Amino acid sequence: MPKEYSRSQRVVEQIRRELAELIRLEVKDPRVGFITLTDVEISPDYAHAKVFFTSMTGEESVPEILQGLRRASGFLRRELGRRVRIHTTPELHFHYDRSVEEGSRLSRLIDDAVREDEIRHRDDDN
């Protein structure tokens, strides 16, 4: 059975897709070229949207990326208003998403612990 999505979930997903396309194709600022939009959260009145992103260039470039995104936010909001039919086009607030890096860090810690455990068990067997 297909999953039911609320209107706000559909709007959030459409906003994420449209912003990703606009950033990729329309924003000429090189500071925002290598980002991926990971999530969008929208306020109940649609007045504000938190847009979460990750960067292929790493966390050290986040301040520059945020500066570029903030500079382009008026353009992005205007274009979003033309593409997404909602009563209020949200004000965009960009946030760096650390969850991907945190997930990688935790995965490495788990791998290290498993490796150490295997070595310890190998030594115990000998």
UniProtKB/Swiss-Prot annotation:
It comes from the Bacteria. One of its GO terms (molecular function) is ribosomal small subunit binding. It is found in: Cytoplasm. The keyword Cytoplasm applies. Keywords: Cytoplasm, Ribosome biogenesis. GO terms for biological process: maturation of SSU-rRNA. One of its GO terms (cellular component) is cytosol. InterPro entries: KH_dom-like_a/b, RbfA, RbfA_dom_sf. The keyword Cytoplasm applies. Pfam families: RBFA. NCBIfam families: rbfA. Monomer. Binds 30S ribosomal subunits, but not 50S ribosomal subunits or 70S ribosomes. One of several proteins that assist in the late maturation steps of the functional core of the 30S ribosomal subunit. Associates with free 30S ribosomal subunits (but not with 30S subunits that are part of 70S ribosomes or polysomes). Required for efficient processing of 16S rRNA. May interact with the 5'-terminal helix region of 16S rRNA. Belongs to the RbfA family. This is Ribosome-binding factor A.
